[in-house]
């Protein structure tokens, strides 16, 4: 019992130390104290995601942005509707419903979608992981959809592309 209790205490102490070091490494107190601007803090922690979310703020109010391979929408600007791809399956789901790229543009437009935020690195991660339901035809149709059916509005590094529906 003594040994198990000692080991448990040691593990808890290491966990507390790791959490404390992580807290101070993230430096949230600088933002809370006002010595670091919030957007600068977010950019340093979230990278291109923060830049893309900030750029959405320039879109017209009431814009509806549908995300592909991006599950995070917490920093979506007020006045906009962001639809995250929570299960990273939006493209797969639409393809299984039989919608072709042209039909998607029309259908999404009828639903009020004005823009598509494509997380290129997220799609590449899913593809390289060999996500079974998506086959080569699905990926080819996605590429065609992005290049022929949508209009590039803005690019954020190699991570994100914001498209608008024509």
PLM regions with names:
Residues 1-31:
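Signature aromatic-anchored transmembrane alpha helix within multi-pass, membrane-resident enzymes
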Residues 68, 114, 119:
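Conserved residues at the C-terminal ends of beta-strands
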Residues 22-64:
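Membrane-interface segments at or immediately adjacent to transmembrane helices
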Residues 157-162:
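Short hydrophobic/aromatic beta-strand or adjacent loop that forms the aromatic wall/cage
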């Amino acid at each position: 019992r003594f040994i198990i209790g000692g080991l448990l205490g040691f593990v808890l102490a290491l966990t507390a130390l790791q959490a404390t070091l992580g807290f101070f490494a993230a430096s949230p107190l600088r933002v809370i104290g006002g010595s670091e601007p919030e957007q600068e803090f977010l950019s340093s922690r979230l990278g291109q995601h923060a830049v893309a979310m900030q750029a959405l703020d320039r879109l017209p109010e009431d814009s509806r942005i549908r995300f592909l391979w991006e599950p995070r929408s917490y920093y979506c600007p007020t006045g906009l509707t962001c639809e995250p791809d929570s299960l990273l399956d939006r493209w797969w789901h639409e393809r299984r419903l039989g919608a072709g790229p042209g039909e998607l543009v029309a259908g999404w437009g009828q639903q009020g979608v004005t823009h598509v935020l494509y997380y290129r690195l997220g799609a590449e991660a899913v593809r390289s992981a060999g996500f079974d339901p998506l086959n080569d035809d699905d990926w080819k149709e996605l590429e065609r959809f992005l290049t022929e059916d949508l209009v590039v509005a803005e690019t954020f590094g190699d991570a994100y592309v914001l498209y608008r529906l024509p």
